[in-house]
């Protein structure tokens, strides 16, 4: 078994490295040392994950529970731990200091001759697993007991990274790109083979173990599996849709719906539904399960679509209405009657045992239409999104206006010859919407309001994402556009994500919540670490369907800024 000490030493070394190439080499060195059985664990750990995202497993450990566990392991009162965190700003550094002090005070003559058994990577994983599965009465005690065991069994350096892992934030800047390249380097396989294996498995842990065990041939044999969701292909806003269509010569035009992405997995009568964030939402949408059983005529299939909440006339309801269905855990049938859903399917990635992502869109479209049956009446609940392949700009404008008149967001403009690229955003899928510019940004700070908002978090520091450094870079503060109910909801959510101390009245917030923000323009600014600031930002909605890493990037901020200059 691989010791957790080895993992912690790698993390510590990476923290001191600024070069991506050197970081990749250190990760590759670690992967080479780890036993093949433990590689999935180590691979996810180094990316600040305990479980693969597709699994739906949640660790369920918050800062309060972590403080109690650390208190029990060290003897330091929780309030003292909270005070120390306000100084260090980091749970990992706090755990390191506390356990260093404890070890110093525990040194005795006999302790010099006692050898503490080493924690293994597997032992750490197993303790996290037990904690994650605890539920009901006594579950908090079980979580605390297992965390306490890890802290008392670890060295101070190991405790630093155990505590960060418990919050799934190692803060060492290692993401999927680095690990992909590290797997290629460690096991001497081409990067493009690793990339494709990741696309079809959505699990770099599986990819790493397969690469070590069987090399290129084994990696090339990996494929999509039912009930293991893959990342969804993404679209980007086109700055010049006319030029993009002319470049394609002909484009596949589809309506763009203001709903929630759904990935459908069907095997016989078994149906599972996954959200954009790859959460299993099957139990929340029983009506959709029955619709799919009835109308998808395939023994096995994985489909991509958009679920839209509709009114009695079949027109789309507000985006937040569909999210109410996705979140629902109780009174599901009652909510289904109150908020009916229409499923609009537009792609297929797998059909009857065959992976289709490497086929062009026009071929995938034929496969999709062949396995979905719905009459005009049925189309109120399920349909294949209408598609027109054309280069006629007047016709495209007509379809665009029809989509808006029907209450939808606009149109998708797709390259008919493009493959399905899981998790990728690029020029093969473009969206055209009305001109009001919005950005999806992550909350990284919040401050208490005044007057009527005195007991509410009323202003939020928002940030874009830098995929190169894996950091969130601030672009401004937003406090307008929110209703009282939205303020209460965000206060409840963000209060549980506060970390570190208060600086200038602003509390640091763990980057978990994505907001859609409208703005008048982007300006250059030295006040934020992104180098940019939003002018007149305004809250539009919470994007529960997006992970923080799906927020708009610093590169997109720069591109929007450059486009503004061209319009002057």
Curated annotation (Swiss-Prot):
It is an enzyme of class 6 (ligase). GO terms for molecular function: ATP binding; DNA binding; DNA ligase (ATP) activity; metal ion binding. It catalyses: ATP + (deoxyribonucleotide)n-3'-hydroxyl + 5'-phospho-(deoxyribonucleotide)m = (deoxyribonucleotide)n+m + AMP + diphosphate. GO terms for biological process: cell division; DNA biosynthetic process; DNA recombination; DNA repair; lagging strand elongation. ATP binds at residues 254, 261, 276, 306, 346, 425, 431. Its EC number is 6.5.1.1. DNA ligase that seals nicks in double-stranded DNA during DNA replication, DNA recombination and DNA repair. Belongs to the ATP-dependent DNA ligase family. This is DNA ligase 2.
């Amino acid at each position: 078994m691989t010791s957790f000490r080895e993992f912690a030493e790698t993390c510590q070394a990476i923290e001191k490295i600024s070069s991506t190439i050197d970081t990749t080499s250190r990760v590759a060195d670690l992967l080479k040392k780890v036993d093949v059985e433990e590689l999935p664990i180590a691979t996810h750990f180094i990316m600040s994950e305990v479980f693969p995202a597709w699994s739906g497993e949640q660790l369920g450990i918050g800062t309060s529970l972590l403080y109690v566990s650390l208190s029990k392991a060290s003897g330091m009162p929780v309030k003292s731990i909270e005070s120390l965190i306000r100084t260090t700003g980091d749970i990992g550094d706090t755990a390191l200091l506390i356990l260093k002090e404890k070890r110093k005070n525990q040194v005795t003559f006999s302790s010099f001759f006692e050898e503490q058994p080493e924690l293994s990577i597997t032992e750490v994983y197993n303790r996290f697993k037990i904690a994650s599965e605890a539920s009901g009465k006594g579950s908090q005690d079980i979580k605390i007991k297992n965390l306490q065991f890890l802290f008392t069994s670890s060295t101070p350096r190991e405790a630093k990274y155990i505590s960060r892992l418990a919050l799934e934030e190692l803060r060492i800047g290692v993401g999927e790109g680095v690990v992909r390249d590290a797997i290629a380097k460690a096991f001497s396989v081409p990067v493009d083979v690793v990339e494709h294996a990741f696309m079809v498995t959505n699990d770099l842990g599986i990819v790493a173990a397969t690469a070590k065990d069987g090399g290129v041939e084994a990696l090339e044999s990996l494929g999509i599996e039912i009930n293991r969701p893959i990342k969804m292909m993404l679209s980007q806003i086109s700055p010049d849709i006319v030029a993009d269509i002319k470049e394609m010569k002909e484009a596949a035009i589809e309506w763009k719906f203001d709903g929630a992405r759904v990935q459908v997995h069907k095997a016989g009568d078994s149906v599972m539904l996954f959200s954009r964030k790859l959460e299993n939402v099957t139990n929340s949408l029983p009506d959709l399960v029955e619709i799919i059983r009835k109308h998808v005529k395939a023994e096995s299939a994985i489909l991509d679509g958009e679920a839209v909440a509709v009114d009695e006339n079949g027109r789309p309801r507000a985006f937040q209405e569909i999210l109410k269905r996705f979140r629902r855990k109780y009174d599901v049938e009652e909510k289904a009657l109150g908020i009916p859903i229409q499923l609009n399917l537009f792609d297929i990635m797998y059909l009857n045992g065959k992976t289709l992502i490497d086929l062009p869109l026009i071929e995938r479209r034929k496969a999709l239409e062949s396995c979905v049956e719905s009459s005009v009446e049925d189309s109120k609940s399920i349909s294949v999104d209408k598609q027109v392949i054309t280069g006629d700009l007047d016709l495209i404008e007509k379809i665009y206006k029809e989509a808006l008149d029907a209450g939808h967001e606009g149109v998708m403009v797709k390259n008919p010859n493009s493959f399905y690229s899981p998790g990728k955003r690029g020029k093969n899928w473009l969206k055209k919407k009305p001109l009001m510019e919005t950005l999806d940004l992550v909350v990284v700070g919040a401050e208490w309001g005044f007057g009527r908002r005195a007991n509410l978090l009323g202003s939020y520091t928002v940030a874009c994402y830098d995929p190169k450094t894996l950091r969130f870079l601030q672009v401004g503060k937003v406090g307008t556009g929110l209703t009282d109910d939205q303020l209460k909801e965000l206060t409840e959510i963000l209060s549980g994500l506060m970390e570190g101390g208060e600086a200038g009245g602003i509390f640091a917030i763990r980057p978990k919540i994505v907001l859609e923000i409208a703005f008048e323009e982007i300006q250059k600014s030295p006040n934020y670490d992104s180098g940019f600031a939003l002018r007149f930002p305004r809250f539009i909605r919470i994007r529960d369907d997006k992970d923080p890493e799906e927020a708009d990037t610093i590169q997109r901020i720069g591109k929007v800024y450059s486009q503004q200059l061209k319009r002057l």
